[in-house]
């Protein structure tokens, strides 16, 4: 699996359930308009959140 589109609209804390499917995941919560590095990491999942800490786009691996 490479993304979790069903997490859009849920809180970042609730979205951390990704760990149930991917225990090795390194979860990063970042504001939706933040600049992030372009490097690719197989274990990293970024949760892009709005000001109310809700996920605003599908959480991709990378």
Curated annotation (Swiss-Prot):
The record marks 38-39 as: Reactive bond. GO terms for molecular function: serine-type endopeptidase inhibitor activity. One of its GO terms (biological process) is response to wounding. Keywords: Protease inhibitor, Serine protease inhibitor. SUPFAM superfamilies: CI-2 family of serine protease inhibitors. InterPro entries: Prot_inh_pot1, Prot_inh_pot1_sf. Belongs to the protease inhibitor I13 (potato type I serine protease inhibitor) family. Inhibits subtilisin and more weakly elastase. This is Subtilisin inhibitor.
